[in-house]
Regions:
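FIC/Doc superfamily catalytic core
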Residues: 1-156
Length: 156
């Protein structure tokens, strides 16, 4: 369902097929869904094995996997954006949301990590996840793929 939000359309039958059996016009959607599955599985493995906590490093790794060979692959996969972006509108002045400037991203993502791993906070886990997701989307650290990464972080 997360991929469908982005306009990606595949059926379960297509998702279970080999790429060679997918019609050429649907292959990008197929690859995008499989990238999402691979990134989610990698994230779950890295976190549950203790190999890597949910961190900027893991978030960048997941982002890189999500954008491999699909829409957004030319927008610095695995790297935080290096310029201002905005959501909606044709320029920042008429945008629905203007995220923080790129030079603040390392500090903001570090703060987000600290929030994630702060066990002293006495709030329900579901509320903590919702706040994390909202803050991640507000920061919008990547040039593309923020929605996909943000939704993928929820089950981690």
């Amino acid at each position: 369902k997360s991929s469908r939000i982005e306009g990606t359309k595949t059926s379960i039958e297509e998702d279970m097929s080999d790429i060679e059996d997918i019609s050429p016009e649907k292959r990008n959607d197929y690859i995008e869904v499989h990238n999402y599955i691979d990134a989610l599985n990698q994230g779950i493995y890295r976190v549950t094995s203790g190999e890597l906590p949910i961190s900027s490093r893991l978030i960048k790794e997941i982002h890189s996997m999500l954008l491999k060979g699909v829409r957004g692959e030319n927008k610095y996969p695995g790297e935080y954006r290096v310029s201002q972006n905005w959501i909606g509108g044709s320029m920042p002045s008429n945008a629905k949301h203007v995220p923080p400037p790129h030079f603040m991203l390392d500090e903001l993502m570090s703060d987000l990590e600290k929030f994630m791993h702060n066990d002293d906070l006495k709030i329900p886990h579901l509320l903590k996840i919702a706040i994390l997701h909202y803050q991640f989307e507000t920061i919008h650290p990547f040039s593309d793929g923020n929605g996909r990464v943000g939704r993928l972080l929820i089950p981690l």
